[in-house]
Regions:
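Short, small-residue-biased leader/transition segments that mark boundaries at the very start
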Residues: 1-10
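Peripheral, non-AAA+ core regions of ATP-driven protein-machinery
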Residues: 9-155
């Protein structure tokens, strides 16, 4: 059962044969493998023996590292069979040590999230510096590490 809310699909299966399959359509496979390694090391999810298929909907190819946080959240959601609240969105680049790095054009991203009706946005804590929060209606949820984002999304 995919967990995507129409934004793409992530499927996970237990591999009962040889090496697990990894597939990414519209997203860099090497980057996905790096994100899977970070999930194993920092959050403790054992994904080494599971198949992971990632598909970005609509035939889009996404190279923006700001999608990293959304990708790992979708993978975790599928692995745990737990939904992410539909009014939550996120932006953040993930580093090798699990840190959530700042992204470009954060105010523009926040504005677009508001226009699309999102109520909360997870974003890198470092991106809060210099943002005029008085005009922002969406709840800003700053996170520093992957583990923190995981706790925020899944309790």
């Amino acid at each position: 059962q995919p967990r995507s809310r129409g934004l793409g699909d992530v499927y996970k299966r237990q591999a009962v044969y040889g090496n697990p399959q990894r597939s990414a359509t519209g997203f860099d496979l090497r980057r996905m493998n790096m994100l899977l390694a970070v999930l194993e090391k920092r959050v403790g999810f054992k994904l080494a023996q599971k198949d992971v298929f990632l598909n970005i909907a609509g035939g889009l190819k996404v190279n923006d590292p700001a999608i990293d946080l959304a990708v790992i959240s979708a993978i975790l959601s599928s692995n745990m069979d737990a939904s992410i609240e539909p009014e939550v969105c996120m932006a953040g680049e993930i580093g090798l040590s699990g840190e959530i790095r700042p992204v470009n054009r954060i105010e523009q991203r926040i504005g677009e999230a508001e226009k699309l009706g999102f109520k909360r946005i997870l974003l890198p804590k470092h991106n809060l510096q210099g943002i005029d929060t008085k005009k922002i209606k969406i709840e800003l949820v700053p996170v520093r590490k992957v583990e923190e984002a995981f706790r925020t999304l899944f309790g």
